[in-house]
UniProtKB/Swiss-Prot annotation:
Gene3D superfamilies tied to this protein: P-loop containing nucleotide triphosphate hydrolases (3.40.50.300)
Record organism: Shewanella sp. (strain ANA-3)
Keywords: Cell cycle, Cell division, GTP-binding, Magnesium, Metal-binding, Nucleotide-binding, Septation
Database matches in PROSITE patterns: G_ENGB
InterPro entries to which the protein is assigned, alphabetical: G_ENGB_dom, GTP-bd, GTP-bd_ribosome_bio_YsxC, P-loop_NTPase
The protein's name: Probable GTP-binding protein EngB
Membrane-crossing residue ranges in chain numbering: none
């Protein structure tokens, strides 16, 4: 089956849900393909989503880290969705709320069968914090590929940027092909073509092709 090119500019807001249980209620079953975006509250997740979809206000950015507490879902087409998970790890968020978020994130990664890939966004100046590693480990344990996206790469000189990229790749080498590491700048557009290529590949898993083929056969 030849992969079609997904136009990420067509992404549109679908629903918000407070946790994974409610997500199951709102969406039409655990079907199709979902690509999740996860990261610490100051990792630039909303800015990255807006840059990748070329929409200034698709994902709301906030000057207050930790404000995004909902799971926000954006539809690419009838079979494919982008999922913006709550930011994690912000110090001023109450402990009970932190624990609730972490439980929700863990449940989503471990239980969502249609999850085709996870983008873990990290500020390139502060990569691989404990919760970042936990997210990566959860995803790989569930056999979900990960893109470790080092955001705000425009904040570093080229030599420092590549040094950090290589250090992160070395730190994650134990996960093999399950984890890719790329630099990204929402401001400058650095890394955007590579990221879109990876997302496009994740939008075409073999099981979705089989699912659509079975639907055609049934008709």
């Amino acid at each position: 089956m030849t992969e079609s090119h997904i136009d990420f500019r067509r992404a549109k807001f679908l629903i918000s849900a407070p946790d994974i249980a409610h997500l199951d209620q709102y969406l039409p079953g655990d079907v199709g393909v979902e690509i999740a975006f996860a990261g610490r509250s100051n990792a630039g997740k909303s800015s990255a989503l807006n840059a990748l979809t070329e929409q200034k206000n698709l994902a709301r950015t906030s000057k207050t880290p930790g404000r995004t507490q909902l799971i926000n879902v954006f539809e690419l087409d009838a079979q494919r969705r982008l999922v913006d998970l709550p930011g994690y790890g912000f110090a001023q968020v109450p402990l009970a709320m932190k624990l609730k978020w972490q439980q929700s994130l863990g449940e989503y990664l471990q239980k969502r069968a249609c999850l085709s890939g996870v983008v873990v966004l990290m500020d390139i100046r502060h990569p691989l914090k404990d919760l970042d590693m936990q997210m990566i480990e959860w995803a790989v344990a569930s056999e979900i590929p990960v893109l470790a996206l080092l955001t705000k790469s425009d904040k570093l000189a080229q030599s420092a940027k590549m040094k950090t990229v290589n250090e992160v790749r070395k730190a994650l080498v134990e996960f093999g092909d399950w984890v890719q590491v790329e630099p990204f700048s929402a401001l400058k557009g650095t890394g955007k073509p590579k990221v879109l290529s990876i997302l496009n590949e994740w939008c075409h898993p073999q099981w979705l092709a089989d699912e659509l083929e079975n639907q055609d056969d049934a008709e």
